[in-house]
């Protein structure tokens, strides 16, 4: 998913269409959030330099690696320095790795496929890209399903493969199949996964964001990050019990959490 976004950001000639699945559009927002190090779910400690090391396949061939080892180590050291894990700040290093800055170079039609429950590449990657494409007026489409990371095929009542085929037939083969007139936004219901909501804009027409004030009284709220105040037991690794206590307990005495409670919604939220 990410590679085709990066290629499209170069403005290379001949690239007519891309279909990023769970693609990254801004590397800072993948590894950071407001100055904090925020790795993907189940990838604690991950960062750009570790990903680069993981992807450097030439290291698997000892003889080949010797010919590039010096250059690789120098480039890798620059990654470690540039990512600045100690501060977590947005910098020129990260700005250069923000493909949204190159949106004016995009020429290809973009069909984004992304899982709403993807906690590896989150939706803060696909939605800003779609909005940027929308603002530029480029041919675009986004399919938001209820799956996780890169789970796209055989989605009930989605016709995903048919849409992909029509997209490629139109933009690569020039077939007049009116795919560009189909809804630009498809969102799978989180209640009935056989139903899909269609719209031509994001947010979808008729939808609105709900704001939740977290400090309505302007009082400063604090918590103490201390596992000893919970039921968590490192020896047992009882994460479920810890989560149940954190979320479900009605007690307000826990010093290790801040809990915001609103009245029930009057209408459905999907």
Tell where the protein language model's regions lie, with residue ranges:
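Glycine-rich nucleophile elbow surrounding the catalytic serine of serine-hydrolase chemistry
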Residues: 1-6, 120
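Accessory cap/linker subdomain of secreted extracellular hydrolases
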Residues: 6-105, 176
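Loop/turn elements at helix/coil->beta-strand transitions in domains of secreted/extracellular proteins
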Residues: 12-17, 107-110, 136-141
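Alpha/beta-hydrolase fold catalytic core
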Residues: 74-107, 238-270
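Short beta-strand/loop motif that positions the catalytic acidic residue
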Residues: 106, 112-114, 118
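Conserved alpha/beta-hydrolase "acid-adjacent" motif
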Residues: 119-127
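Catalytic histidine neighborhood in serine/cysteine hydrolases
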Residues: 133-150
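C-terminal, loop-rich substrate-recognition/catalytic regions characterized by aromatic stacking residues
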Residues: 155-270
